[in-house]
Amino acid sequence: MTEYLSVSALTKYIKYKFDQDPHLQSVLIKGELSNFKKHSSGHLYFNVKDKESVISGMMFKGNASKLGFEPKEGDEVLIEARVSVYERRGNYQIYVNKMQLDGIGNLYQKLELLKKKLKKEGYFDQSNKKLIPKYPKKIAVLTASTGAAIRDIHSTINNRYPLVEQIQISTLVQGTQARQDIIEKIQYADSLDVDTIIVGRGGGSIEDLWNFNEEDVVKTIFNCQTPIISAVGHETDFTLSDFVADVRAATPTQAAVIATPDQYELLQQIKQYEYTLSRYIKQYIEHQKKQLNHISSYYKFKQPSLLYDQQIQKRDELERQLNHLLNTKVEKSKHHLKLLQQSFNFKNLNQQITQEKQSIYQLHSRLSKIMSNNITNLKTVLKNKLESLNNLSPTNTMLRGYAIVNKDNEVVTSTHKLNENDQISLTMKDGSVDATVKKVRCNDE
């Protein structure tokens, strides 16, 4: 009699075979996660697929808690698992013990975790950024000794600002020894008393650029006292060195542009300053000319004697006062002498007279000396003021060969006020001349 198996019996037998096969107890699988779900219990459910096949999988909470990343839909992963059968559905599936991102994905995960850590510690804060000097004298360039990056940086700096001194510091930018070499070269550049440091290299994969994501490289850049421009990779490439540097440049060429001013723009600025200064000086001179012409038109300068007439009168008044004081003093002395003659006996009269004469003589000498000194000082002051007035006098100016130009009874102070065939009058030291303007020449033409 033929014996039939139940579905559950067959399923259990197949599961038994799977579980007894040592090749299925620990398999290494590479694939892409799909239909990923995290159950409220903490277990993970998903499919692992490649271009041709799909297999169901799950990971218990205990193993899932040990993962160093958060799995998600589309992740390329490397899995260590055992293969067995889920009896209830009769499906075979994998029970995952370990899981990690495959290759580049793992690097991106590591990069993201380190970025979050450094950001939390304040390494990327804008408040820590240093300003790039506008007019550097020395720039240190850290990059490979050959390649497009160094050529682009040097040629751009030479074209924009040839005055700056470039210090080339060759460094490894890729490979296992590059990390330590980059750190040492940055520290060396920081000791050279340069104004700016450019750290750069050409583009590449995340593996090629990884040395610029190393934590100790990032911290070396952060601790550098010299402003640093990071120019690692192309515009779409980002490294942690870009975030910690004072300025990030999309390319090595842009780094050179950021580090230097444009010599042609500077020349244009200098010309603008020169024009502004020249215009200001001309305006100032014109203003001073107008002030001088305005002052020279004062009535007192046309008749200089009015300036010192009062001084002469004041001097005469002082002289009169001094003479009056002197005469008064003499009269008082005479009166005093007379009283003395009356008060003393005849025997002492000659002696008293002699003493009074000496006193009067000394007093007279002192008064005469005071009066003479005052008169001399007044004459000196008057002479100095007369000389100052004569120097300002239009007449004295004409004595040195200058002439005053008048048109329609007004003084002409600029060639801009004259036209050809205008009738003018030239006033000189000994008379005046009528003339006709034949040609006008202006200094600013």
UniProtKB/Swiss-Prot annotation:
GO terms for molecular function: exodeoxyribonuclease VII activity; nucleic acid binding. It is an enzyme of class 3 (hydrolase). The keyword Protein biosynthesis does not apply. One of its GO terms (biological process) is DNA catabolic process. InterPro entries: Exonuc_VII_L, Exonuc_VII_lsu_C, OB-fold_nuc-bd_dom. Its EC number is 3.1.11.6. It is found in: Cytoplasm. It catalyses: Exonucleolytic cleavage in either 5'- to 3'- or 3'- to 5'-direction to yield nucleoside 5'-phosphates. Disulfide bonds: none annotated. Keywords: Cytoplasm, Exonuclease, Hydrolase, Nuclease. Heterooligomer composed of large and small subunits. PANTHER family: EXODEOXYRIBONUCLEASE 7 LARGE SUBUNIT (PTHR30008:SF0). Belongs to the XseA family. HAMAP family: Exonuc_7_L (MF_00378). This is Exodeoxyribonuclease 7 large subunit.
